Amino acid sequence: MKNELKKINENFENQIESVTELIQFDKQIMDFCLHHLKSLNDKLKDGAPKINNPYYLADNAIMALEGIDKNKSFTKHYSIIYNQCLVLLVSHFTLTIEKIFSTVLKFQYSNDKLPKSAKNQIQLTLDEIDEVNQNPNLLKKLLVAKKKLTFQNIGNVIKSFENYLGIKIDKDQKLDDIKFAFECRHLIVHSVSKADEKFIKNCNSIKNRSIKKALYLDEEVRFTKSELEFVKFSMLLFMQELTEKLNG
């Protein structure tokens, strides 16, 4: 199981890194353009042409691009990209936590290590037990069907790990940051990022989050690079600590 969890974690880290590259994509483009414009400008000024007429040089273009970066002129446009990055982060987290749950559930069942409370809750028929004994991967699918198991919100994730694996998840700041990310993901996908009463009510109970502590009705929720860093760090730390606990 340790090797499987390690691979799942490594894959998650790679997915997070791919989102990081997307977050930084605008800076990479800007740096690329500035580098080549400045190089061209130096060649025009100091090379054989010895051009000094601003009309033929790239000084104004360089200043304009540097101004965009300095004044954050395109922040509103970038925020759409950053919000979609948040959606990606939550999607990667959801799929990863589901894979971890499935891996541990299969291991515990196959090695007769399921907690007593979990055995009482699962309640399989004789036919289902026979099917699962032949293919332990079916156990999670049966739970999804019979118990309406879902990993689309943190509350259900916590209950699933406690009820079926006997694993208690710490309720701390990083968990609140992840809870908030899940709420924002739902808002971005279903309400075009505009804060409604249900969203604000749900977020008011997430008191220990480290980002966007002030929310207002009908305000558009826009993520920044630094806020995405908080979410990324919380998710990575959560996965690391959970894996260590499972490997115990």
Regions found by a protein language model. Name each.
Residues 1-13, 17-18, 184, 190-248:
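Polyanionic, low-complexity intrinsically disordered segments
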Residues 55-184:
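Helix-loop junctions and short alpha-helical segments
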Residues 15, 22, 26, 40, ...:
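Amphipathic alpha-helices that form helix-helix packing interfaces
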Residues 42-45, 107-127, 202-217:
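Charge-rich, acidic-biased intrinsically disordered regions
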Residues 23, 44-47, 51, 129, ...:
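Short, flexible helical or helix-coil boundary motifs
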Residues 8, 12, 19, 26-29, ...:
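Generic structural signal of hydrophobic/aromatic residues within well-ordered alpha-helices
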Residues 1-91:
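Charged alpha-helical initiation segments
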